[in-house]
Amino acid sequence: MEISWGRAMWRNFLGQSPDWYKLALLVFLIVNPFIFLANPFIAGWLLVAEFIFTLAMALKCYPLLPGGLLAIEAVIIGMTSAAHVREEVAANLEVLLLLMFMVAGIYFMKQLLLFIFTRLLLSIRSKMVLSLAFCVAAAFLSAFLDALTVVAVVISVAVGFYGIYHRVASSRGEENDMLDDSHIDPHYKTVLEQFRGFLRSLMMHAGVGTALGGVMTMVGEPQNLIIAKAAGWHFGDFFLRMSPVTVPVLVCGLLTCMLVEKMRWFGYGETLPEKVRDVLQQFDDQSRKKRTRQDKIKLIVQAVIGVWLVTALALHLAEVGLIGLSVIILATALTGVTDEHAIGKAFTESLPFTALLTVFFSIVAVIIDQHLFAPIIQFVLQASEHAQLTLFYLFNGLLSSISDNVFVGTIYINEAKAAMENGAISLKQFELLTVAINTGTNLPSVATPNGQAAFLFLLTSALAPLIRLSYGRMVWMALPYTIVLTLIGLLCVEFTLAPATEWMTQAGWLATLS
């Protein structure tokens, strides 16, 4: 017997999502207009909380759908306007271009990356050393590349590793569905679970590595560029001014990496199963035997394009997204990828997230229009100069863990600069606050995927369900890093920032804002 019209509509609404999730979203959509009529400020914070809820439930339903419905309603009831959303999207066009083109560009370098990381994985047997290598590599790369790019690289490598073993375990060859474990023998499933734990830990080490490296340079994170521009700092100035905080944090972050692996805390410590190592070794041996001269040329071309990518980003020869587009053009033209459908596959990973980020900008527009952060900013600027550093750091960290880093960093640096121009704070205090704002925006935000775009990208990627990386598990595995990075950063802002900056200024290493 065919189901009723109402039941059919309910099943279609958000598809396979649980009924309780669908009901919760309907409740949000119904109550928001009434709360907005009663108190717009409370309604604004409620909308932010609801959006965070959709991100937390990313594995129940991709956040673009529920988050998009909330954003559309916010515009309709007047919490913000379509024109303001367009302004926010236009202001963040660089980030959208990055997602569309840079992530797709990395897709065409996967052969080289898989080759390099397979050699790395097979040559380093110690899990602690391997984890440290992944963390250091991610930190170094993210100091020059955007963190999203680095995470995209590691995701592509992890999916490659997982796919190789899953095909063998399921005995289904190229037609294998990596999400389907029904054809896998129980013995293989045990090994597969261990392999998933191994990949989860590597992904988290690499993800935190991007935060450790990204905070150090003005090109490491999008908000760093905005902060550096407001302060009038160039690449060297930015690195030196951040170093009293970022260098100790980097050292302690790497020590944390080794400690959690050694002690097997927080879900870390899982080693690469020997059966998987054997499969990867066989795959590597077969790949080398089958590799033709044409294949070798492709690897060489991809390596040259990789050099171009790092050089262009480090020297800022063009916007990040446009450099990514050049990578797509060069990689496809020089490796013979000419079919439209083959090129289109490169965009399947990044475009859903690009759409999600666009929805997020509409939530940012609500935050601005409803002045949700205004009371916090006023409170901080009323404190003493020494307390301001700590408060800016902590409030940046708190807000960055639930909101967009670029937005939080932009709001605070603009407020700090306005305070300096109005005579509320001195130039020296502004320069110290700039460091507190940048480190506060970048370091504590590793606490949740909401705070780090790279973490959110990982959570919503095709890899997350394969290795069973949920929102809660990601927060739990990030916890030791969150504690160490936040506390060491806070201690450095409190005790080493001012004296170290004073010493570097007297030594003539630092230029001041003119």
Swiss-Prot record:
Keywords for this protein: Antiport, Cell inner membrane, Cell membrane, Ion transport, Membrane, Sodium, Sodium transport, Transmembrane, Transmembrane helix, Transport
Source organism, top-level taxon: Bacteria
Catalytic activity from the UniProt record: 2 Na(+)(in) + 3 H(+)(out) = 2 Na(+)(out) + 3 H(+)(in)
Residue spans crossing the bilayer: 23-43, 63-83, 97-117, 120-140, 144-164, 202-222, 238-258, 303-323, 357-377, 391-411, 447-467, 475-495
Record organism: Salmonella gallinarum (strain 287/91 / NCTC 13346)
CC annotations in GO: plasma membrane
Coiled coil: none
Keyword Transmembrane: yes
Entry keyword Transmembrane: yes
Compartment(s): Cell inner membrane
Protein name: Na(+)/H(+) antiporter NhaB
Sample GO molecular function, one term: sodium:proton antiporter activity
Record HAMAP family: NhaB
Function: Na(+)/H(+) antiporter that extrudes sodium in exchange for external protons.
Family per similarity comment: Belongs to the NhaB Na(+)/H(+) (TC 2.A.34) antiporter family.
Main location: membrane
Gene from which the chain derives: nhaB
Topological category with respect to the lipid bilayer: Multi-pass membrane protein
